[in-house]
Amino acid sequence: MPNQGPVSDWTECSSSAEPPAVARAEGGGGGSAGHSYYQNSKDRIKDGHKVNSPRAKLQELWKMPQTVHTPKSMTEPSFLKHPDLTLVEKHYLCSVAKIYNANYLRTLMKRHYMHVIQRSSQKPGVLTHHRGHLSSRYSQKQHYPCTTWRHQLEREDLGPPNTAAASAPEMIQHSLWRPVRNKEGLKTGYASKTRCKSLKIFRKPGRPFMQSVSANDSESYMNEEKKEEDLLNKCMQSMSIEEQGEHLMLT
């Protein structure tokens, strides 16, 4: 076959690991000498880039032995003194022992909780918010009829404690007095102030809940609620007694 010569030249050249351009030039398959020179220079640049690539450097490093520096404090345990362990294996065991060390885990947990406490101190805590929510729900259930003596009791409660019990009958008498209208049609009297506020609670507004919940705070809170309920019962009894007296006087 007339084409057998070039094919045999191609196989021989390909087995000798030469570039295809050189094989074509030698086998008479076409192509100029300048093209073959350009191809050879391009392959040389590519080979030079491969030699200087990080992968080639990594392969060279794998062939060379590398030293691992292990601290002296980590070489004291008995399990690291086995004669068959290499330095790399000892370093690996040191890292595992550090992870499972109780002191190391305790340090990490302490750091985490300190970070959480620092973040929670910048804004109201969960317990504070929960306590405020409960107090608001309790105050909604403690609504009483809006009367004048209740507001007077709140004003007197802020003052000395002895004056609250002494001034209770006067406040009850004022509460029975009906407000009248003046010439301008505006209401006067004690009840005019109560019209401005809708269903004000008898309970004093609690202290701002910015501290953590404790046993002393809960006890003082319950004691204040009990005192206010007792005062309310006394006022209700005195009011009923005066109403009965006025009813007897009218009859």
UniProtKB/Swiss-Prot annotation:
InterPro entries: FAM216
Region (Disordered): 1-49
Chain intervals with Polar residues compositional bias: 1-16
PANTHER family xref list: FAMILY WITH SEQUENCE SIMILARITY 216 MEMBER A, PROTEIN FAM216A
Family: Belongs to the FAM216 family.
Designated name of the protein: Protein FAM216A
